[in-house]
Amino acid sequence: MKETRDPSQIRVVVGMSGGVDSSVAAYLLKQQGYEVIGIFMKNWDDTDENGVCTATEDYDDVIKVCNQIGIPYYAVNFEKQYWDKVFTYFLEEYKAGRTPNPDVMCNKEIKFKAFLEHAMSLGADYLATGHYARIDRSGDGEVKMLRGVDNNKDQTYFLNQLSQEQLAHVMFPIGDIEKKEVRKIAEEAGLATAKKKDSTGICFIGERNFKEFLSQFLPAQPGNMETMDGVVMGKHDGLMYYTLGQRHGLGIGGDGEPWFVLGKDLERNVLLVGQGFDNEHLYSTSLSAVKMNYTSTKKLPGKFSCTAKFRYRQTDTPVEVELLADGRTHITFAEPVRAITPGQAVVLYDGEECIGGGTIDEVFKSNEKLTYVG
């Protein structure tokens, strides 16, 4: 439904991270006349690898920006929910030899569930965040989620698990602005975060040495690196540290093309490797997905065509989607795709609209399951 009330009658809670995107989101809403409250979420209790408590620094920046804008602010703590719903899943997936996407789960369970419920308990009409995505309320009562205008920053890939009910209460104030314009707005407004660099770490955990961090929670089990023919090429540090298509960190010398991770043999604790970026073993023609979510409540046909992304910032691939009787979804690619990775998200699009997504579970080539992939 299109919003008809005057902005001054609408209360919006903004999830503020201490970064420039959420700062500008709050600033724009305030400029547009909404009643705005800034809330900082603390979901992880730790210091980064330099001994700095990044959450404290980030909250200090939130306070500065909220004072500059002239809005109330406070912090909420969802550490237990984050551990139970996101981090436990993250570790379980790595244990199973897969490569999880914690940002997708964090958006589903924390930002747009626990935090959205908290915002609603404060009498908020909407929760706003600094995501690069757009909301379209102009249709037939259903809300659509569209790609962000800045194609390089579009974050609908990470928002694929949001439901119609969640989207009805969400605003993305910077979704129709390019990143460089967001920086410009922040600088012109004199916001404290205008020149702060973007974070690139794990959702809420921050930037740190990934191997060191993961080894605190999961014991590493070194083993052999082998070719598909069983030739031992060296040792790996633990299967959880590697992902499909990875080149760096293998330490295999010699002549010829670079070496890449082709798969994992979990039973033997072997990392499968091969030469060449376009190694045939890296390519597949279809996948099966689980935990599919569709943003619309309308019934889907049993088969339909659309486009898909299998990783963030990837160009769309035309696909055929088939809903199977057992609840799984089979997705066939128009042409073979490289390094489809179990545990990662597959996200579906109809033009500009993100129509949903799920988790890659099994990978196939010419209808034959690739057992070495996951």
UniProtKB/Swiss-Prot annotation:
Report the sequence similarity comment from the record: Belongs to the MnmA/TRMU family.
What's in the keyword line of the UniProt record?
ATP-binding, Cytoplasm, Disulfide bond, Nucleotide-binding, RNA-binding, Transferase, tRNA processing, tRNA-binding
Which positions does UniProt annotate for ATP binding? Answer: 15-22, 41, 130
Q: Which GO terms describe its molecular function?
A: ATP binding; tRNA binding; tRNA-uridine 2-sulfurtransferase activity
- Lineage of producing organism: Bacteria, Bacillati, Bacillota, Bacilli, Bacillales
Q: Write out the coiled-coil annotation as residue ranges.
A: none
Just give the chief location class: cytoplasm
- Which region ranges are annotated with the description Interaction with target base in tRNA? 101-103
Q: Which GO terms describe its biological process?
A: tRNA wobble position uridine thiolation
State the residue spans of region: Interaction with tRNA: 153-155, 311-312
Q: Where is this site: Interaction with tRNA?
A: 131, 344
Q: Which cysteines are joined by disulfide bonds?
A: 106-203
Q: What role does this protein play?
A: Catalyzes the 2-thiolation of uridine at the wobble position (U34) of tRNA, leading to the formation of s(2)U34.
- Cell location: Cytoplasm
Q: Does the keyword section mention Nucleotide-binding? A: yes
Q: Which reaction does it catalyse?
A: S-sulfanyl-L-cysteinyl-[protein] + uridine(34) in tRNA + AH2 + ATP = 2-thiouridine(34) in tRNA + L-cysteinyl-[protein] + A + AMP + diphosphate + H(+)
Give the CDD domains listed for this entry.
MnmA_TRMU-like
Kindly provide the name given to this protein in its UniProt entry: tRNA-specific 2-thiouridylase MnmA
